[in-house]
Amino acid sequence: MDPDRQADIAALDTTLTTVERVLDVDGLRNRIEQLEKDASDPNLWDDQTRAQKVTSDLSHAQNELRRVEGLRQRLDDLPVLYELAAEAGGPDEVAEADAELAKLREDIEAMEVRTLLSGEYDEREAVVTIRSGAGGVDAADWAEMLMRMYIRWAEKHDYPVEIFDTSYAEEAGIKSATFAVHAPFAYGTLSVEQGTHRLVRISPFDNQSRRQTSFADVEVLPVVETTDHIEIPENDIRVDVYRSSGPGGQSVNTTDSAVRLTHIPTGIVVTCQNEKSQLQNKVSAMRVLQAKLLERKRLEERAELDALKGDGGSSWGNQMRSYVLHPYQMVKDLRTEYEVGNPASVLDGDIDGFLEAGIRWRNRKDDD
């Protein structure tokens, strides 16, 4: 094997060893053993919330261990692959080994990004809200396209998605939608998506086929856990009930099952209509309200810290990514400069490259 390839393999070994240390592989094995014991408890499903968390945590831990062990095995096999290529003496065998080296580098770098998720709430599940912005019906359609993009991303990773509320626009698309992604580190991963997303395309709703620019805002919150102590006095909440509605304003329920919660002190409003009963919708809406209040508390603490540090802090609420479908095709993140020339793939949920670039960018910003 030539020295350059040996150096590449040695560098990957150093990176993977660091990843294994940060992830604490031995500790991960012990955690899996404990979760397997918990999962085998015949009384586990007496508490469905705890049961779902145990099974979800077990699945994630097992997948993470398989992933890092698989990378180690592939890296150990790589020198052998080059030896076999040298013995065969053909260019095709060397090209195959080089392709595996390149793919392994990509996979190890992706795993390395996981070690950067060390924020206070990064390991939490996520609550995502998408709102249409300027651009009329095109913006509503764009908001629905973004919702589909994130749900497709979750599906590709086998992450369960729970839709809390969808407010449909009159002609097409959605005014807003709120859903949860139930996966460890979903918040740390998706939080880099928070901000304004811009779409440029030929409008399918314009009779003259003119180019239209549309905007939609993405908000990402961590799911609240019992340890967060987000207590809301009953007198601080106004509860309104109404009938669930579907596309075009049509009623999809003959009972007043949809719930709107208004937090009186802050004016925060949360709606939920996707569950079958009023009680279920109220429980789901309360979870989202708690997440919003937790985020409000976190931002207030961050503002106080920024004031003490003498800077104005940073805001994610600005335009952060542009999706151009016409006159050329390009999706570009304006913070990281990461770009992809295949918008169809991105809109179908292939956003891992943007997420990884965003996490690395955020980590560098936090270090500054």
Swiss-Prot record:
Disulfide bonds: none annotated. Keywords: Cytoplasm, Methylation, Protein biosynthesis. Its main location: cytoplasm. It is found in: Cytoplasm. GO terms for molecular function: translation release factor activity, codon specific. GO terms for cellular component: cytoplasm. PROSITE patterns: RF_PROK_I. Pfam families: PCRF, RF-1. Methylated by PrmC. Methylation increases the termination efficiency of RF2. The modification N5-methylglutamine is found at residue 250. Peptide chain release factor 2 directs the termination of translation in response to the peptide chain termination codons UGA and UAA. Belongs to the prokaryotic/mitochondrial release factor family. This is Peptide chain release factor 2. It comes from Mycolicibacterium smegmatis (strain ATCC 700084 / mc(2)155).
